[in-house]
């Protein structure tokens, strides 16, 4: 049972004010030192990660997200160094104007203050959140899942040791206990926490949205579609579908449903051919099932049910939906999308333009795999999450998306009556 956490929240809030005094040069030095420590402490971090892995069935779709390796830690260290090379998002002049009475107004970017992150079995998020929050001048409170508790504790202990060497208040990053009481406390930490960002399943995101008393930016849940249009190129479609589905099945930008125009059902076996090697189970509607029967392995071909559509599989599974028209494809996406990433494969430019205008999603692709929905791929550096809402940010959230602004007004004794 978690004890009262208000003392912890107050300590983080106080540390956030100290963080505002750090120079960008010092912040960059800390980030590079954390990258060095990540490599130096690889054995320790991996040994703690193994404890978490030992408690999880390897067939669990979360297993790949939970697993850290030497190569992944090298990638994390490289990402941390990359954040250090990015320009500071703070103190940017967003707008400048003067009023007739002589007042000068300047709109300046500033940190949010304290950001709470609630996430599941993804220990790499601990690194990403810390590096982005530090660079943007935000203190952070991390609430990881019990599946990754040993990994997260190891990571935060490594970060705290670096902060101590720089004489920086370690409360700028705090890891909460991995229990539900801590989640409830964080969601109700009004007066201490400025923003909550959940990263994980739709169940987690819905719970946070329904129970938080603090502003929330929803991220993570991705029910992604690729529509193979009447005018689609078969080779491009096959490559895009295979990549979007199998690159990493456990991530939110992975493909969940291929929609195909009925005039192109004859191309469906070719479009799905590469999926056989990855042993992707296909849940096909009646027309798609008939088109694939005899071409796709029988043990991997299943009739679709209503539940097959609108499902984020996070596994080697994919639904196939047949439509009579472009409009029907748009309707299916509208009904089942989580507004994350949607793709059309077509050689018809007018059709592509209509798709990008009409489809309501954070990222809309033409002839490109949805696997590219990622902060680094967008040139933003690491990301704190992928927002599926419209306020305050949308899509991959880099440094700029976790800042706010203030108006600074200068004058010479002006008054208003």
Curated annotation (Swiss-Prot):
Its EC number is 1.2.1.41. It catalyses: L-glutamate 5-semialdehyde + phosphate + NADP(+) = L-glutamyl 5-phosphate + NADPH + H(+). One of its GO terms (cellular component) is cytoplasm. Its main location: cytoplasm. The keyword Oxidoreductase applies. InterPro entries: Ald_DH/histidinol_DH, Ald_DH_C, Ald_DH_N, G-glutamylP_reductase_CS, Glu-5-SA_DH, GPR_dom. Pathway: Amino-acid biosynthesis; L-proline biosynthesis; L-glutamate 5-semialdehyde from L-glutamate: step 2/2. One of its GO terms (biological process) is L-proline biosynthetic process. Keywords: Amino-acid biosynthesis, Cytoplasm, NADP, Oxidoreductase, Proline biosynthesis. It is found in: Cytoplasm. Gene3D superfamilies: Aldehyde Dehydrogenase, Chain A, domain 1, Aldehyde Dehydrogenase, Chain A, domain 2. One of its GO terms (molecular function) is NADP binding. Belongs to the gamma-glutamyl phosphate reductase family. Catalyzes the NADPH-dependent reduction of L-glutamate 5-phosphate into L-glutamate 5-semialdehyde and phosphate. The product spontaneously undergoes cyclization to form 1-pyrroline-5-carboxylate. NCBIfam families: PRK00197.1, proA. This is Gamma-glutamyl phosphate reductase. It comes from Bacteroides thetaiotaomicron (strain ATCC 29148 / DSM 2079 / JCM 5827 / CCUG 10774 / NCTC 10582 / VPI-5482 / E50). The gene is proA.
